[in-house]
Each structure stands twice: as C-alpha cells, then as structure tokens.
Swiss-Prot record:
Entry's Gene Ontology molecular function annotations: adenine binding; adenine phosphoribosyltransferase activity; AMP binding
Organism in which the protein naturally occurs: Methanococcus maripaludis (strain DSM 14266 / JCM 13030 / NBRC 101832 / S2 / LL)
BP-aspect Gene Ontology terms: adenine salvage; AMP salvage; purine ribonucleoside salvage
Gene Ontology cellular-component terms listed: cytoplasm
Name the record gives this protein: Adenine phosphoribosyltransferase
The protein's assembly and partners: Homodimer.
Protein location: Cytoplasm
Listed InterPro entries: Ade_phspho_trans (IPR005764), PRibTrfase_dom (IPR000836), PRTase-like (IPR029057), UPRTase/APRTase (IPR050054)
Amino acid sequence: MDLRKKIRIVENFPIEGISFKDVTPILKDPKAMKHTTKEIAKYLEDKNVDVVVGPEARGFLFGVPVAHELDIGFVPVRKPGKLPYKTFSVDYALEYGSDSLEIHSDGIEKGQNVAIVDDLLATGGTVLGVSKLVEKLGGHVSALNFVIELTELKGRDKLKGYDIQSLVKYDL
C-alpha cells in the first residue's frame, strides 16, 4: 500500500508557509491503519521489544495499535501535569525555546527494550527527549519508528546512534 496517497497535505497550516502532513486519513481508513501498524510491528519483530512508548498526542494513535500487534504494553509520555502518578521529566530543545515531557516513574523497568513510536520525525527534538526519559529510567531504546519523516529538517542527524524507521519520507 502506498501510504503517501493516504496522507493529506494541508498548505499554510498551522501557519503561513508550512505544508502540514495530516495523518488523520490513515486513522479513518482501517486498511491503511492496519498496514501502518503491521509495517512498524514487522520492523520491530527481531528487536526483542518489551514495551512501546509514544509521545502525546499522535504517538498514542500509532503506538497503542503497534503495542497490541506485538502483544506488549504501551507507556504514554505527556506534557507536564497530565500524568496522575509520580513522574520523571526531561526538558528538551525546540527550534525556538524548550519544552518538557513526563513519564510515569514506573513506566519503564530497568533493562527493558523500548520502541518509541510517533507520527512524525521533523527536527528530532521531541523523540530525543522521549529517548532520554526512557534511558533515565534504565531502558534501552531499541528503535524509533515514524509514519512520516521530513528529511530536510535533518532529525536523523540529532538521533545518531538510534535505529530509525520511517514509512514515508518527504523533502520539504
């Protein structure tokens, strides 16, 4: 299946000059969603992954089905103040400024192999922050999996040393 045909391009969203890659048509199409889930799960089959981690919000949409396909658990990573139990946090750099992410303190067990699943790899800042959280808890990041990669933003450069999968690549 050509997933590129299922990704809607919305020009000038959320601001002028941005060409937004909208994954909601994949979510709406059960065959496209199943294909996406199976492609990521197939990539992870030989990586001995114990748990899938996904950043809010679209990481939840793809991470949970992948975890179910692999018959393993899912751990959410959220913005500060959104998780009800004790958390660990990390600050990470954005293109202009910084942000924070949190994970439950018991979300990852020491030595667990973790796949981080998200919809989009752009600059790599968010997933690098998520990776640091996983590693802070003693987990090993086995793979970073994305539906879309915006290659010109060079997120891969920031993620050297990690095993990266992206299903669809766009040059800006």
